[in-house]
């Protein structure tokens, strides 16, 4: 089996990504739930391709260790969104919903793949989509940031 290039000393850099376009979508389902012992297993890869028309889920955590390869337990569920402009999403990308910054992508969980991917976002305080006032049709933007987590 091929080695995961981000998990060892295969690449000559810790940051192979130098520029990318935003990934943009629209909220299609709002969530209102929390979990204290969820056990999300974030994959080692810090990048995923998001295809136009696919549905993905946004979940938030305040756990400081949340990063590629980590296990995340304390979460709040935000929303599902449909990708309108596809591209690459990276750990460290800033997530905005309805023009408001939510937090940075911590990593990705594939529990429900191939149905959808769980995008785990690091925030100061985990609140559900309903608690944040997320609305159907809100624009979701995942934007590259120069300062990576």
Model-derived features: positions:
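Short, basic/aromatic beta-hairpin or loop at an interaction surface
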Residues: 61-78, 116-118
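Short beta-strand-centered aromatic/proline hotspots
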Residues: 101-111
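Short, well-ordered loop/turn sites that connect or cap secondary structure elements
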Residues: 88-90, 95, 134
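Conserved "cap/hinge" positions at secondary-structure junctions
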Residues: 98-99, 144
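Short, solvent-exposed secondary-structure boundary/capping segments
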Residues: 111-123
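Structural motif
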Residues: 93, 99-100, 138
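N-terminal intrinsically disordered, low-complexity, charge/repeat-rich segments that act as generic
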Residues: 1-69, 97
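Short alpha-helix capping/helix-loop boundary micro-motifs
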Residues: 78-85
